[in-house]
Curated annotation (Swiss-Prot):
This is tRNA pseudouridine synthase A. Substrate binds at residue 114. GO terms for molecular function: RNA binding; tRNA pseudouridine(38-40) synthase activity. PANTHER family: PSEUDOURIDYLATE SYNTHASE, TRNA PSEUDOURIDINE SYNTHASE-LIKE 1. Belongs to the tRNA pseudouridine synthase TruA family. InterPro entries: PsdUridine_synth_cat_dom_sf, PsdUridine_synth_TruA, PsdUridine_synth_TruA_a/b_dom, PsdUridine_synth_TruA_C, TruA/RsuA/RluB/E/F_N. The active site is at residue 55. Keywords: Isomerase, tRNA processing. One of its GO terms (biological process) is tRNA pseudouridine synthesis. NCBIfam families: hisT_truA. The keyword Isomerase applies.
Length: 261
């Protein structure tokens, strides 16, 4: 059966997350239902596999999944057909590509990239409601960057993972954690860019929630290092809400899509 990789974008707001769940809407089940109209295997209950299982309310601009289909589709026609059957769900197939049988969206990936959007202003968000986390107070960019520097590299991230995390080890290597600032009407937007081979459950939201406390002046930057060294979930700052989080890309040794960056 030919295997296809799918590059996927979605608004996570109406979904209970990526993973299929009984009687709850998910991105996975939405795409599988669309595939079921095109492929007998999916009509009979076949499943797709994704690079990352995003939580409820988390968005994606560069999720990757793979599917084994009965028919050897032209990739462009496959993406067009899927987008037709996905309407009106806020899910889009940006590209499809024929890949080798040993390609696996999750296990072949060597990096994952996330963006978190944090907006500091008092007036409510309108256009970006549900697409960024908003706080009403000013934030200190330099302090947040100083706190973030303690988290780069290979560490035991027990403090920054959910108590329900199923990963075998809390040790991860955080390859990138940068923060940019931009002016918006009557406020500032802070964009956190994170990159690693893989992440623990709630790791990104735990990191951003902690750094927000640093930016607000509630934590000194050095307390981030102390929290990390504690290897204790109770030492973490608050876990920020999901709506500002985006899975923006997945890296592979051989990029499956011609315009992959």
């Amino acid at each position: 059966m030919p295997r296809f990789a799918l590059l996927i974008e979605y608004d996570g707001s109406p979904f209970a997350g990526w993973q299929a769940q009984a009687e709850r809407p998910s991105v996975q089940s939405t795409i599988e239902a669309a595939l079921g109209r095109l492929d007998p295997g999916f009509a009979a209950g076949a499943r797709i596999a994704a690079a990352g299982r995003t939580d409820a309310g988390v968005h994606a601009t560069g999720q990757v999944a793979h599917a084994d289909l009965a028919r050897d589709w032209d990739p462009f026609r496959l993406s067009e057909a899927l987008n037709w059957h996905l309407k009106p769900a806020p899910v889009a197939i940006l590209a499809a590509a024929r890949v080798a049988d040993d390609f696996h969206a999750r296990f072949s990936a060597h990096e994952r990239r996330y963006l978190f959007r944090l907006v500091a202003r008092r007036a409510p968000l309108t256009h970006d409601r549900g697409r960024a986390w908003q706080v009403p107070h000013r934030l200190d960019l330099a302090a947040m960057r100083a706190g973030a520097a303690h988290l780069l590299g290979r560490h035991d991230f027990t403090t920054f993972r959910s108590t329900m995390c199923q990963a075998n080890s809390p040790v991860k290597t955080l390859d990138e954690l940068t923060i940019d600032e931009a002016e918006i009407p009557q406020g500032r937007e802070y964009r956190f860019f994170l990159r690693a081979r893989s992440f623990l459950h709630n790791q990104v939201r735990s990191i951003v929630g902690t750094l927000e406390r640093v930016g607000a002046g509630a934590w000194p930057p050095g307390r981030v290092a102390e929290a990390l060294a504690a290897c204790d979930r109770a030492a973490c700052g608050p876990v920020c809400p999901p709506q500002g989080l985006y899975l923006t890309g997945v890296g592979y040794e051989t990029p499956p899509f011609s315009d992959s960056r």
